[in-house]
Amino acid sequence: MKQYILVCCLILGAFSSGRLCAQESGTASFYDNYFNGKKMAGGGLFDNTKMTCAHKTLPFGTMLKVTNLANDKSVTVKVTDRGPYVKGRVLDLTKAAAKELGFVNNGTAHVMYEIIRDDKAEPVDSIQFQNSQFIT
């Protein structure tokens, strides 16, 4: 009987259609122009006109959909740096991304973000978030 249950679980797991998609919300800010041309943690040079961001733990190259919860505007950004290092903030975005999201004048915005692509080998559903909501 135990073998039968094990086989059923393996078959169900093999044909499972969905992966978990994590979403997180919090405060986002954007980089000052001072950082243009400075080296980022991911190795490249910072460019405030690109659609990139900093996240504390997600792998470099991870693509995120970021939505400003105040106006429902969204952008797609690539994780290229580490941070933010200000308590309560979840992302540092480039000024270009902040303009698209409509919060340059405010300095910060309450955003939600979700992983839309992870170029690294690490599976998306193994990444640990704080205060995550998981949907299938």
Language-model segments: what does each one mean?
Residues 6-11:
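Hydrophobic helical h-region of N-terminal Sec-dependent signal peptides
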Residues 4-5, 20-136:
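Secreted/periplasmic proteins
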